[in-house]
Regions:
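Iron-associated oxidoreductase/ferritin-like identity signal
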Residues: 1-188
Length: 188
């Protein structure tokens, strides 16, 4: 006689349960029942990321305007392009804060105290490139840590940060290449 198997419980939630949960917790917006992270902590972390991106936009913009010299035109264009891309990151992060139920903090008086990177100064061209390279390296390390932190608890935020990280790594490489071009040797 064949042994009867117990019915296998599916790992997916049935559609009726999903619908009922969505209706019951409608006030949660994009933060659903299955969100495993600490929403308040996620928002606080993202506020610091937002501040970092704003400071980067401001620094790159200032450098794009302030860069001078016979060989500055290409560098100015690179700074301006990076400022535009950082502004895109800023908008992504602000939108994610909003999705999690927070209000993005654009308060200019607290930006530098909340940001991982520094604003910098308008020195000579090589100094500007170095400041941006340092800021990008800080962002890369910081975002890698945050990606590990969010992991499976908040895949939406993790995925957003992974996309931003790829661009920040490209920015760091661009700044390194500019530094090599203007100093004549790699900084290894």
């Amino acid at each position: 006689m064949a042994k009867q198997k117990k019915p296998v419980k599916p790992f997916l939630t049935d559609v009726k349960t999903l619908r009922d949960r969505a209706r019951k917790h409608i006030a949660g917006g994009g933060v659903t029942f299955t969100y495993k992270g600490d929403v308040k902590k996620a928002i606080d972390i993202l506020q610091a990321v937002l501040a970092t991106e704003i400071v980067c936009v401001l620094r790159y913009t200032m450098h794009a305007v302030a860069a001078q010299g016979i060989s500055s035109e290409g560098v100015k264009a690179e700074f301006a392009q990076h400022a535009k891309e950082e502004q895109g990151h800023m908008n992504e992060v602000a939108e994610r804060i909003n999705q999690l139920g927070g209000v993005p903090d654009f308060n200019p008086t607290t930006l530098t105290s909340r940001a991982a990177s520094e604003y910098g100064t308008a020195g000579n061209l090589v100094e500007m490139i170095k400041e941006n390279l340092i800021a990008e390296r800080i962002a890369v390390d910081h975002y890698r840590e945050l990606i590990r932190y969010f992991g499976d608890k908040d895949p939406g935020t993790r995925t957003m940060l992974e996309g931003i990280l790829v661009v920040e790594e490209e920015h760091a490489n661009d700044m390194h290449d500019l530094l090599v071009a203007h100093q004549g040797h790699p900084m290894l």
